[in-house]
Amino acid sequence: MKYDFDAIEKKWQKYWKENRTYQVNIDRNKPKYYVLDMFPYPSGVGLHVGHPLGYIASDIYARYKRLKGFNVLHPMGYDAYGLPAEQYAIQTGQHPSITTKENINRYRKQLDKIGFCFDWDREIRTCDPKYYQWTQWVFIQMFNSYYCKEAQRARPITELVKILENQGTGGLHLACTKEIHLTANEWQMKDEKSKQAILMNYRIAYLSDIVVNWCPALGTVLANDEISGGISIRGGYTVEQRKMRQWCLRISAYAKRLLEGLDKIEWTDSLKKMQRNWIGRSEGVELRFKIKDENIEFMIFTTRPETIFGVTFIVIAPESEWLTQTIISKKKDSVDSYLNLVKRRTERERISNRKVTGVFTGSYAVHPISGETIPIWISDYILADYGTGAVMAVPAHDSRDYAFAKHFDLPIIPLIEDIDISKESFDIKEGIMTNSDFLNGLSVKQAIQKVKEYIKDENLGKIKVNYRLRDAIFSRQRYWGEPFPIYYKNGIPYAVDEEDLPIKLPEIDKFLPAETGKPPLGRAKNWTYKGYPLELTTMPGFAGSSAYYLRYEDPHNSECLVSSEANEYWQNVDLYIGGIEHATGHLIYSRFWNKFLFDLGIVAKEEPFKKLINQGMIQGRSNFVYRIKNTNTFVSYGLKHQYDVTPIHVDINLVFDDVLNIESFRDWNSEYKNAEFILENGKYVCGWAIEKMSKSMFNTVSPDNIVNRFGADAFRLYEMFLGPLEQSKPWDTKGIDGIARFLKRLWNLFFENDVLKVSNSLPLDKELKSIHKLIKKVSWDIENFSFNTSVAAFMICINELTLLKCSKHSILSDLVIVLAPFAPHIAEELWHLLGNEATIFDSQFPKCNEEYLKEENVKYTVSFNGKARFILNFPKKISEENVKDTVLKCESSKKWLKNKIPKKIIIIPNKIVNIVFD
């Protein structure tokens, strides 16, 4: 019987669907295991062969866990809101609701063809009102909560109102936008608008006027992780800094817990390091400075308090709240000019850029200890929302301050004895202090402790732990996103009633963003709630993905996000697979949301993802043509060095073995219709490179074509065979032929002359050894995510069983079960051909019997007077007398004995023979 992968795969995909093979429910008789993939953006071009890599790995693991007796939750859905979906709709001139639905249908067909064990009854789409009702609900909870630093948890805002009524802000230790000092009487005297403004200072979801990354072309605010090199990752548009009123989430309140939680989860060290750096904990001192001749004080945070006597200037951020109070009139024009320059640079550019820029405000600060005057400058290397937005510059001991001082010819005072700062600053925290008043002669470590005590005793500031992590900007001036459940009454924002959720995204004709920043929802008719205007911005792309893993646990519950029964059973995700590029975006936002919901008692576990695997990238092999500059002439690869050329990506489908199909190339792009070509040996040879697989590089390979040609099982096995899961590796379609041949050999093992040949005879020792060697290897590989070596092990086992002409039912049954997680279709078919009626995934993964793996021969090290000389192989069951006799008769022994008679022969069974002689 011929192996017809197409018929087999369609047959079993239909069977699994009709029999709901992968539908899962709470079963308290089984241990649970929750496997999750980062759900995809349903883009217009569909999946390429790089996308399913992580999905296949998680599918193998989920199937394996099911075969090991676990009740496995393995769902899938679509991250359908946000920029990717909206930009595709704009490019195609269609409404995003239409394109998103079409794209989801395309993805579903592609995923189904690969044969995943997803429980599609639990599918979610972030653009579905039944889903985003709960995104809106979580936002309302954040709006109605504040964060108590003493309790280290979120509390209801109504509780804070009662505290303010009874005691004001005295003695409170709360996460806030800025410190407010208020008595109970002062609170009681406030009107409603003032009270709401004060509460906004503490809400976890709050409104604030902040500097944002504004992209005019996209018409929206972008997060830092959505920008690279000053341009938007999506579309490649220019980004600038702009102050806007935005909704924010107070993730900074959770910085300490986010940092501590990293020690409790199984994530890679590299990913944990990325999050630790992003959170950025630092210990230091917050010092109080005064502006000369003004009754104005401001605080500066420093991690180097011992350098206080080396401060020669102060630098404040261009967005600093103290900016207007420090600029003197004659400096206003130069400051304004500088601010216009800075706004075109993103935050990351400002941090990474080494070019020194700045402007003097004309004002001076007073040194808190010496009383000396210190000039106040503005520079874009200072960020407004890190620390206090101002630094005390100590150029002798900080490289950026040093560069600034050198550029503007400002004083540099060394504070460590016997150092050379003629060319660079001395940043090392060691040495003996000098030029430091009462700190002179102390070591740096001693000086730090002494100056901290002095600052505390003299009330010059306070000891403080600071975090780099900043609050998440949550507003987007776009259409395709979750509407905020917020309305405005007399200009004051209020949450809508929970029973009125969801607030559905309205249908509007013109959804394109405006460069002015006016949101598209401003065009919606009757966009009101009980007669009051609703919020016009929408939530960002990460809103729908921040708690989606919880909704999978209880997707049809109309009463709550997730029931306590469902969450207590499924708890958090046991295995999460996705890209490391989400380290400081989705992965940190999800941890924050989960901790907030944990505070509310909604979830049982504080961390959302126990174990996280970051799959590597499947790279594409790109091809290039070379156009001679300022012409429409293309020169072949081997001749390009003779000309001044520009390399241009070309669609790999127009190239075969790096030779360009010229006529197809002309038809591909009208610009090249009349192009001329300089050939080598009558051919146009293209260049090539291994790069990220991307439609912009025309190097994508569709999994549909591979599955149609070789089958889903071959595709799944080949993706795993390419290399270790966590490493990047290039795609090469030619390599899949070997996998296809392997599956045919597997199939032929079950047949002889097209007739099923299966015997119930007892298996041979060699057959048992081969299959149990495979069971042991594959079990270890799956548990350790080493799927590529499993594929090699399958090939070895099939070759061994083929040589043995194995047809034993017990051996073949174990073989197909072990193979089933990797190649489920052929395994299911062979399983039923072996006489089984239920799905193979209701069987049990076989256990390795180590007895079958014991070697038939053992190696003895032969020693003379304790010195090892050579090794001999013996049958495992040989007697000690036979070992002794064989060793003494061996020619090598005669060489070392030299006709001497052994005094003693010591034998350690299966290991050593030691011959003792004089």
Curated annotation (Swiss-Prot):
Record's GO cellular component terms: cytosol
Short motif 'HIGH' region, span: 40-51
Motif segment ('KMSKS' region): 692-696
Gene Ontology MF: a single term: leucine-tRNA ligase activity
Stored CDD domains: Anticodon_Ia_Leu_BEm
Chief localisation class: cytoplasm
Locations listed in the record: Cytoplasm
Superkingdom of the organism of origin: Bacteria
Keywords: Aminoacyl-tRNA synthetase, ATP-binding, Cytoplasm, Ligase, Nucleotide-binding, Protein biosynthesis
GO biological process: leucyl-tRNA aminoacylation
InterPro entries with a match to the protein in the record: aa-tRNA-synth_Ia, Leu-tRNA-ligase, Leu_tRNA-synth_edit, M/V/L/I-tRNA-synth_anticd-bd, Rossmann-like_a/b/a_fold, tRNAsynth_Ia_anticodon-bd, Val/Leu/Ile-tRNA-synth_edit
Catalytic activity from the UniProt record: tRNA(Leu) + L-leucine + ATP = L-leucyl-tRNA(Leu) + AMP + diphosphate
Residues annotated for ATP binding in this entry: 695
Top-level EC class: ligase
EC number, as in UniProt: 6.1.1.4
Family the UniProt entry places it in: Belongs to the class-I aminoacyl-tRNA synthetase family.
NCBIfam families the record matches: leuS_bact
Protein name: Leucine--tRNA ligase
Lineage of the organism: Bacteria, Pseudomonadati, Bacteroidota, Bacteroidia, Bacteroidales
